[in-house]
């Protein structure tokens, strides 16, 4: 229809209705002013004038122009239809994109929440636990080292006390041997016994348990008459009693040392077992820390991807809104243009059916002849 209309308008462009003709009222002239703004209005008036000038029937003219107006109405209806379809597509697309954006925002929130409230606290907790395990290992080794040093010191003390006891027992045995041979002891022999007692006292000076007994024994040895067999037996008995006590003490020292060594070895086993457990726990915790670090990296990558996806969706939504806004502007402009043309067409058709238009055509024909 547009091609036909353009061709016809080109043909009719050489003709124009004389709006200053006396047949037109002021209202008609206002209508002409509005119609002139419309290509279709001008076309209908010029077409109507030409049709009537060539002997056409007004009823036929009305029919043809009505068909043209109907075609305009159909085209406008198609514009409305296409815009309605575009609106449906737009609404569905916006609904889809907004739902996807909402879902993506929820994914972004969940990813950030998982990172902030799970992975980071877990990382800090694992680091603190690993630090505690390493401190436990260090403390375990310090405890073992201290126990080893203490055991060595205690054993050295044991050996020192054993040497002291053996030295004292040896002196006692020597004194007993001397005393057993005495019948009429000489001053030299008595002094040797007294010297042995002093030696015993020096050997056992750290053992207060024996000091009082040895001191008493020294006093007896100094004051006793070794020629007196009763006094001699008393001294022998005292020496033997002291020897028994020293042997008992030595046996107790040996038993205590064996028990201490046994306890130490058990403690070493326990500490080494604890150390092995700590080491295994470090391996496990290190693996957990590595897994946590990998998960943090994956989550940060996921957050980047989700943000990129969200930006893409927002971009698509903005593009759709912009495209629809442009389509709406085009639609409104098109509808406005069609309405203007239809309004002008109806006004032109109304003028064509006025008796004044027929009078105008007749006057134009008379003027031509």
UniProtKB/Swiss-Prot annotation:
PTM comment, free text: Two components are produced by post-translational processing from the precursor peptide.
Family per similarity comment: Belongs to the TMP family.
Designated gene of the protein: T1B
Name used for this protein in its record: Trichocyst matrix protein T1-B
GO CC term, one of those recorded: trichocyst
Annotated signal peptide: 1-16
Coiled coil: 56-180, 262-354
Propeptide, residue positions: 17-55, 190-225
Localization terms from the record: Trichocyst
Main location: other
Known role: Structural protein that crystallize inside the trichocyst matrix.
Keywords on record: Coiled coil, Signal
């Amino acid at each position: 229809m547009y091609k036909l209309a353009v061709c016809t308008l080109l043909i009719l462009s050489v003709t124009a209705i004389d709006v200053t003709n006396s047949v037109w009222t002021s209202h008609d002239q206002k209508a002409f002013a509005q119609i002139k703004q419309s290509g279709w209005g001008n076309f209908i008036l010029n077409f109507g004038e030409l049709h009537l000038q060539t002997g056409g029937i007004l009823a036929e003219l009305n029919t043809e122009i009505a068909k043209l107006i109907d075609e305009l109405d159909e085209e406008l209806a198609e514009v409305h239809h296409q815009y309605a379809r575009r609106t449906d597509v737009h609404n569905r697309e916006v609904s889809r994109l907004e739902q996807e954006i909402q879902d993506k925002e929820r994914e972004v929130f969940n990813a950030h929440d998982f990172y902030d409230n799970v992975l980071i606290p877990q990382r800090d907790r694992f680091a603190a636990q690993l630090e505690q395990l390493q401190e436990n290992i260090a403390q375990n080794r310090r405890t073992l080292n201290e126990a080893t040093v203490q055991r060595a010191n205690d054993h050295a003390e044991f050996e020192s006390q054993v040497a002291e006891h053996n030295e004292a027992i040896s002196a006692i045995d020597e004194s007993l041997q001397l005393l057993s041979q005495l019948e009429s002891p000489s001053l030299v022999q008595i002094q040797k016994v007294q010297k042995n007692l002093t030696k015993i006292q020096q050997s056992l000076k750290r053992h207060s348990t024996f000091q009082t007994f040895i001191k008493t024994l020294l006093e007896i040895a100094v004051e006793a008459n070794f020629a007196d067999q009763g006094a001699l037996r008393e001294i022998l008995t005292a020496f033997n009693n002291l020897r028994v006590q020293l042997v008992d003490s030595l046996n107790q020292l040996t038993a205590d040392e064996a028990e201490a060594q046994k306890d130490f070895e058990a403690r070493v086993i326990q500490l080494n077992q604890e150390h092995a457990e700590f080491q295994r726990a470090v391996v496990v915790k290190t693996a957990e820390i590595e897994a946590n670090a990998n998960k943090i990296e994956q989550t940060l990558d996921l957050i980047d991807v989700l943000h990129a996806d969200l930006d893409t969706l927002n971009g698509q939504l903005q593009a759709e809104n912009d495209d629809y806004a442009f389509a709406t502007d085009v639609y409104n402009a098109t509808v406005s243009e069609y309405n203007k043309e239809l309004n002008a067409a109806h006004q032109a058709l109304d003028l064509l059916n006025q008796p004044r238009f027929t009078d105008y055509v007749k006057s134009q024909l008379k003027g031509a002849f």
